[in-house]
Amino acid sequence: MGRVRTKTVKRASKALIERYYPKLTLDFQTNKRLCDEIATIQSKRLRNKIAGYTTHLMKRIQKGPVRGISFKLQEEERERKDQYVPEVSALDLSRSNGVLNVDNQTSDLVKSLGLKLPLSVINVSAQRDRRYRKRV
């Protein structure tokens, strides 16, 4: 079983990341020295725990957004994703020979919105193909 991290360690690490994200790295030793310079931490053991959890969170941030932590770069990235507009519209009739191929649900949605689009309804099976071979 792993060790339990206290609320103090988690709060301190999140605060460090939100304020000093550009200075932090994926290296524990570097983060430990940075914790020493930035914060006044009572004990060496607590400093090491905070630096370790900070390093752990930095590795998670590299993979994707982490719940409870927001910093400027992450906010900008989220904003860009929200403002994304595809180059080619899914409703562009010139690319699909004047008819859109949709399933039953999408067809109902288009009708409820009151859009007058030429639709071709395609039956979609409820089950997807298995990605892997079934174990015997």
UniProtKB/Swiss-Prot annotation:
Misc note: Present with 30900 molecules/cell in log phase SD medium.
InterPro entries tied to this protein: Ribosomal_eS17 (IPR001210), Ribosomal_eS17_CS (IPR018273), Ribosomal_eS17_sf (IPR036401)
Superkingdom: Eukaryota
UniProt protein name: Small ribosomal subunit protein eS17A
Protein family (similarity comment): Belongs to the eukaryotic ribosomal protein eS17 family.
Signal peptide: none
Record GO cellular component, one term: cytosolic small ribosomal subunit
